[in-house]
Structure formats: structure tokens, C-alpha cells
């Protein structure tokens, strides 16, 4: 019998650090080759795993993987009908039909078939798993042997766990029926890793069509022995270390294909001659390097050994770029930095601290947020790195930077208003606020200093909280240790579910313990919404409830920079040009449109 989900793995904060071996680096005499440098390494080609959704992996996948849909900066689903169609054929129950276009082909020449979708459903629905990962305080898996012995895709999706029935296949179509409404139905399922490669690796079937069919048969028959091998291959065969040894398994559907993986150092992509969709490759080869420090990236640009560099946006980096002859430099914004207030840790903002008086706790939260000098944070900390920076007023950045509307308009700190709220609430003693923050980041450290100074005028004693187990683990597992978290909030691959999971009472990622009747009513309505045109209004209602309750405050988007060699560069004309490259926002869940400069049309 197919069963409901037993577990869900949610990545809240990704801190990626990977070492690697070295090989000879690309040389400047590289006709037809574009070299990109970034600060995040590629770790997996499997977008169903946490490693595959890490920023460096998302960057690579967005160029080598095509599919039914991509996600733009605003969280909107962008359909690619050249790959196939996604149709909602019924609302009750929610039923979605996928039809694969005959032109959709893997880079080894094998056609894309419903077997590829069926494999992804099996992996992400959790219906076939019979063992769940056990994690330590750092989020590391501790029961690898049990996972290897059982059926453990270990990648249940909050959306696909609601698709509990075995999908039906008819020719080039696969039909999925959900047990409950799923607002993210447009992006919940897509082609990910190739079923035929998994079948060849896990089941030893050589012929691609027969290998894909064998995977489908194992899923339909619930063959535990075969599924154990299939789930293990799905989970590990597309990691960087595995692909470094077997790059032939890095089969893809997009305009480029993976040709070489050097873990922790670089990935080399080549033109995919089997690709027949829009936006074909405009270079013979694209090399993405992650082995250079920020200033080394600038040096590579100056030397002509890199064409596009995306180093960390710091004053030193910008000054160095100013010295590069002919460099075209663009700055922009990435993930939104927010102050999220802990309401369940028996601390400064928890009603329990005030004898259970929710109104007093709300007043303290509102007062603290009024002391935050957002205009000064932008002008003094961020604008020197990104002159166009503005105060971020939308509260739901996991959907997109403008999701939820401008519910918290910008302005200077309102010290008088904050003092009045505390007086009316009868709070006369100083309030200590422990802030969970990465103080090794100069940007956030400078922001915290301004927040501390302003809040002190009202009687808030702001102190940085040093994480014990790490920023991510303490964000999730130590609610009684901090009162506010100053954290970047990246976009989610399931934008609407991310709002539900984060803000409704008892949500899987509700790390601040937020509970509020208005928020719950708004998220309940959002959870029932399957009309994409109705989503904006539902998100606005959620955001308004959060603003009214003093749950969270958006500050500003993190500054980012990208630089390319302009026409005045000494090396111009000797290596490929990379025009119109936008700043690289690695906090996005999908970077397909960022790669427009590397594609035709």
C-alpha cells in the first residue's frame, strides 16, 4: 500500500564549504570558452536533494537542466512548452497532467519519457520510503547503513507528499492526483535525474529504454529490493564526487551538458547537441570555477583568464574592480535580510515572559522593531556597496523580493513611538534582546551595531548571540537561546509552501514559534488556493497579519556584484564576450534566466 509521508527534510540555512583536488586550470587562449567565477561550489546535479539545491548546484543545474517550468525572481512559474505542458485538469481532487514534447531529449540521445517523472514522484512523495534519516545537532545523517539497506530516497517534498496515489501513465503523459489542494502545483513535479541512468547504475540494465522501464516496473510493483538500489543510486550517484569519477552519468536536458567535474574547484560544460529547445548554447564551453577567493576572482578578470566574476560584494572588492581596465561592473541585491522575532523561547518577545499577556508581548515586539533604523542601515551600510539599495518592505522573500506588498514602509527609527508603546504596556525595566547573527560578516556586524545603538535609546539592551552548534542548527534547535535572528531569507523552490511552513502555527519551519489567529486564517486560505491569479491577494493577507503582530521586519537585500570584461579591456577580442550579465543572486531557487547571456535568442 502507498502511505502518507513519514518525514520531510527542510533546509533552512545552507552554509556550504567544500574542499577539493586540483587540476590544471583553464588558460586564457580559449576560443569559444567562457569562464565564470563564483564563491559557491557545485555539490550535486540532483535538484531533489539539499546538496542539489545549494547555491552552487542551482547555478549549474539552471544551465544544464531543462524542464516543464522554471521560477523567476518574483516566484512566478515560467512554463516551457517546448519541453512539454503542465495542465490542471481538475480542482476536486486537484489533478495535474504532464505531457512531454517529442523533442525533449537527454544529452545522450535518450528521449525524455514519463518514466523520468515517475521516478521523481517516487523519490519526492515519500510513499515508498521505509526508513527515514536520523540527524544530529548539525543536521548530519547518522544512520547511513540503515538508509543503504532500506528504501530511502530521503527527499520528501511538502507538495508531493500530498500526491499519495500512484500516478497514471498514458503514452507521453503522466497524471498526478493530489489528496489535498497544493498551491505550488505548477512547480511541484518536474523532470530531474534520468530514469535510464538510474536503472543502468542500480539495476545493471544496459539498454536505456529497458533500464527506464525497469525503474518504472520496480515503482509500480513496489519491489523493495530493486527500490533499495534505485533509491541509493538516486540519492548519491549525482553528487559531485560521484560525477567526478563517472561524468557519463551527468546526463542532462538543457542547452549545455556536463563534461568535467572537479569537486570544490570547477565544473566544465559543453554544448548539448541533442538540445532542440529555445535558447541554445552560445558558447562551445562554459567553465564555472569556485576555487578562487574574491580578490583572486578580480585578478583573474584583469588577467583575461575569467570573463564573468561574481565575488563577494565588499569595499575591497569594489576598489579592486575599479582598477581593472575596461571592466563592466554591476551591483544589485540578493536575499532579503530580516529581523525575525522569537515568540516561543521564554525570552523578550514571548507572552510567557509577561505572565501570558499576549498584548504586552506584542507591544514589546512592535516597540523593538520601531527602533530599527532601516533608512540608516541602507544609507550607511549597504548603499556604499550597492548605490541603488532601498529599504526592503515586503515580508515574504521566500516567494520573491516583492511578495506580500509594501506592508512595512521605510522610514527612520521611531524612538518616540517605541517609547510610547512600552509605557502604555507598563514595561519599565530594560529588555535584553539576544540577536542570533553571523558577526563574522562585516555587513551584518555593522547593521547590528546600528540596531544596538538605536534600540538602547528606548531601553533595549541588544547583545549578539554566538551560535553554539552553528547558525543554522541554533536557528532551528535553540529557540530559548535567542530573541531575534538577523538572517538572509533565500527564495524557495516551493514558494507558496515556504510561506505556509514558515508562518502557520506548528509549521515545519516555524523557527520563531509564531502563532496568530489572523495569520492562521490567511495561511489556511492560501493553502486552499490553486488559482495562480488569486495568490497575490492571499500573500498580502499573510504579510499584513505578520506586520500587525510584530513578527518580522525586512531590512534590505544583501548587496552583490558581477563584473565582466568590457570592450575597452586589454584582452577584448581574444576571448568570448559576455554581454549584459546581471548580478548573480545565489539566494534564488532557480537561475535559468540569469544564464540568458550564455544562450542564443
What are these regions (language model features)?
Residues 136-234:
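Surface-exposed binding/hinge segments that line
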Residues 22, 365-366, 370, 378, ...:
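Extracytoplasmic/peripheral linker and loop segments enriched in polar/acidic and small residues
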Residues 123, 244-247, 273-320:
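Ligand-site clamp/hinge motif
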Residues 385-424, 439-444:
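Structural transition elements
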Residues 37-91:
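N-terminal lobe/hinge region of extracytoplasmic solute-binding protein
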Residues 112-122, 171, 175, 255, ...:
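Alpha-helical secondary-structure segments
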Residues 262-265, 419-491:
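Ligand/substrate-recognition segments at binding pockets and active sites
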Residues 86-150, 172-180, 184-188, 297-300, ...:
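Aromatic- and charge-enriched surface segment that lines or borders ligand/interaction sites
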